[in-house]
Amino acid sequence: MSRPIRTLLFSTLYPSSARPVHGVFVETRLRELLRTGEVETKVLAPVPWFPSTDARWGEWAKMAATPARETRNGIDVLHPRYPVVPKVGMTVAPLLLAAAAIGPLRRLQAEGFDFDLIDAHYFYPDGVAAAVLARLLRKPLAITARGTDLNLIPRHALPRRMIRWAARRADASIGVCQALVDVLRGWHIDPSHLHVMRNGVDLNRFRPLSREQARRELGLDGAPLLLSVGHLIERKGHHLVIDALQLLCARFPQARLMIVGAGEERERLAQHACRREVASRVTFAGAIANDQLACWYSAADVLVLGSSREGWANVLLESMACGTPVVATNIWGTPEVVAPHVGRLVVERSGNAIADAVQQLLASPPSRVAVRDYAEGFGWEETSKSQLSLFGQLVSAERGRDDA
């Protein structure tokens, strides 16, 4: 092409000044793609409408405080509002998203940004809405599956039918791991439209720091330290890491756990730590900006991820890029991330299984240099090249149809 490919990224999973860590993994992939200099983009990231910015409303207040348009890291981001309808919201969300987006998309075109394709992230409701928009605007469409959009939501019959419809309408369906692509293949989606493009890790942002220095900065001593990073929701398994800590204290009586993240389970997790009699050994650090996490990973002896569902868990790569080994549940794309010499996978999702795996790593830790070396095989370059190649093919095919 004589000019850069123009993409329109469409997803409700995208950060804003009001919610800077929300969907940061989508922003990261886009920023890495833009570094090639071969793509221009704008982002349409719809936000549920809410009337109040009063802090007592928590996440809803942050949504209300999200600006209608902003520039993040040099990228023009629009945040149109869409209504959330109680009880039936899950069913009608794709149409409400599409209806909220069509006006802003037309305005972008009127401003001179006539994008070549839609790059949608998360199949439901985002991907379904994007399929509607792509059909209306006659644009090629790529949808990226990221986890629960294919390993949880399809348990509901109507969303499953809509997801299948969108996958058949899409010119390309991308999975961040092979396990997600296998779901689409099982639905008999055209194999030529299926692509695995794993998430990478920013090897400059996430790099090993001196453990002693990192602990000094965080006010920690030299005791064995477990780290659990993720939203404070049940499926992330923080409660299981607390269970594991209790069991580990028999052999490692000074062991501690740092939990990084915010969410609805904060108080329940604190109560759980009290019941397990390890409350004094558990610290809730709250949400930490992505660009500050390297210090936390470097301070830890082991990162633990006790999730029940993941597509491609970015925290595992971030930790390993900092030289810190990992323990994770053996689910979905996680076996594609963790090798035996840099961590442990647990088949049984329980505190006992996690404690056994952590104990193995504490007793015989892998070299931090070896862990970092392994993570260096997961940079973004390959994924960005694959995206460029795919997007170029989609745009060329669309132009060929127009010329026919």
Model-derived segments and their meaning:
Residues 1-71, 398-399:
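N-terminal subdomain of nucleotide-sugar transferases
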Residues 24, 128, 224-247, 264-270, ...:
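A conserved mid-protein helix/loop that constitutes part of the nucleotide-sugar donor-binding site
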Residues 179, 200:
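Carbohydrate-associated surface elements
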Residues 270-288:
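Nucleotide-activated donor-binding/catalytic signature segment of Leloir-type glycosyltransferases, i.e.
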Residues 287-288, 295-300:
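Short alpha-helical donor nucleotide-sugar binding micro-motif in glycosyltransferases
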Residues 308:
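Aromatic "clamp/platform" in nucleotide-sugar-dependent glycosyltransferases that forms part
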Residues 325-328:
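Short hydrophobic beta-strand element within catalytic cores of glycosyltransferases
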Residues 340, 344-351, 359-365:
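Conserved acidic donor-binding segment of nucleotide-sugar-dependent glycosyltransferases
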